[in-house]
């Protein structure tokens, strides 16, 4: 199964990377490594996660982030990577744009 990270999700990753890098030098890189590892696991586990707001939601193991994706034919499309600490109405609004 192929994984495709859409530009909206890439933007989410960049924003979170910048935030964590300002917290501690190297933490942003650790964040990216962790999230990419979580996303890579979708090759084996895509479609097994709960559906939330029309997307499957993978919760990151080390950071309070969720990966929102859909399985389309033989591909996993990652639409958003969002901080779970955000206001739920903000998350709904963000996902409704996809």
What are the residue ranges of the model-derived segments?
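Basic/aromatic recognition patch in beta-strand/loop cores that engages polyanionic ligands
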Residues: 37, 44-76
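Arg/Lys-rich, positively charged N-terminal/basic patches that mediate binding to nucleic acids
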Residues: 1-32
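Short, hydrophobic secondary-structure boundary micro-motifs
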Residues: 29, 50-52, 90
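Residue-level recognition of specific faces of alpha-helices
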Residues: 12, 16, 38-41, 57, ...
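Enriched for short, Lys/Arg-rich terminal
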Residues: 70-98
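Amphipathic alpha-helical recognition patches that constitute DNA-binding helices
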Residues: 4, 26, 30, 57, ...
